[in-house]
Amino acid sequence: MKIRRLERSDYTNLIYLLEQFQASCGIKSIEQGTSNEEHVRQVLLRCEKGGLSYVGEVNGKIKGCILSIIVPDLWMPQTLFLREIAWFVDKDYRGTSMGARLFAAYKKEAELWQKSGRIRAFTMAKLHNSPNFDYEKRGFQYIESQYMSGE
């Protein structure tokens, strides 16, 4: 198992993994949606070039990822935040160290970006059906809940 930064050559394998994420997220309107591969590729490019993203690779196949993008603060555009948008591990690799190793690599680099002033802070999200992961124990502060209309 290898944890490394996202590269453009990963996109096709990663799109397949993200389709698994879409199908298992527990939100009907997303699970039943039609994905637009070109849009997903553009988001991945933004994650690769203007964010911080890692993949978990096993035998040349992408089996896990943590993807993030940099976004400006609403009131202070020069203040940037790193926002995690997907953290997913293939069901056959859950229970291994892949998820923890992806998180550790992401957090370590994000902390360096924060110390250097490149970003002000970084965030992690948790879906309602995500595994129980104690972010506060890992130095994060609980700041919000999000709700979605529709099914």
Positions of predicted regions on the chain:
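Conserved beta-strand in the GNAT
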Residues: 55, 61-70
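Conserved GNAT-fold acetyl-CoA-binding loop/helix
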Residues: 22-42
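A short helix-loop-beta-strand connector motif used in the catalytic cores of GNAT acetyltransferases and
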Residues: 42-55
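Conserved beta-strand-loop-alpha-helix junction that forms the acyl-donor binding cleft
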Residues: 106, 116, 120-133, 150-151
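A short, internal acetyl-CoA/4′-phosphopantetheine-binding micro-motif in the GNAT/acyltransferase core
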Residues: 85-96
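A short beta-loop-alpha structural element at the N-terminal edge
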Residues: 2-16
